[in-house]
Amino acid sequence: MSRVAKAPVVVPAGVDVKVNGQVITIKGKNGELTRTLNDAVEVKHADNALTFGPRDGYVDGWAQAGTARALLNSMVIGVTEGFTKKLQLVGVGYRAAVKGDVVNLALGFSHPVEHKLPAGITAECPTQTEIVLKGADKQVIGQVAADLRAYRRPEPYKGKGVRYADEVVRTKEAKKK
């Protein structure tokens, strides 16, 4: 039985929550996020808190309620504080630059890689080998970071490639003669 769903999500001041059936809209200083929840979940909004529970007739009600609570908690954090994800480029000649909503990457290919950012996501490059992604939607930030990393994943011998800032790349020993 899920214990995650038993804890309510506290809605801070300045955050507007609208519950319309299974569609939840959360609006704050960083934007507006909308999510449609599973039919097995019942959401109640009262006293600046969201409470979750299962609907009758659904076997996986508590599991889905725990998932819904985690997703809506991330939405509340996103519209109040926002999320950041840092990437590092490791390798000779690997560079990054941001122009508007396009991230330009030089990753050792014969052509530069241009990645267009989705709406609601901003990027900045404090140095030529760092990318900082910011936004309100945790899932979209993670997906953009994974897409950028997929252009040149860290290889296991020298560790060259695009990696998350907190990622530890295990390197292999070179073949012995």
Curated annotation (Swiss-Prot):
Keywords: Ribonucleoprotein, Ribosomal protein, RNA-binding, rRNA-binding. The keyword RNA-binding applies. It holds the Pfam family Ribosomal_L6. GO terms for cellular component: cytosolic large ribosomal subunit. The keyword Electron transport does not apply. One of its GO terms (molecular function) is rRNA binding. SUPFAM superfamilies: Ribosomal protein L6 (SSF56053). Belongs to the universal ribosomal protein uL6 family. This protein binds to the 23S rRNA, and is important in its secondary structure. It is located near the subunit interface in the base of the L7/L12 stalk, and near the tRNA binding site of the peptidyltransferase center. Part of the 50S ribosomal subunit. This is Large ribosomal subunit protein uL6. The gene is rplF.
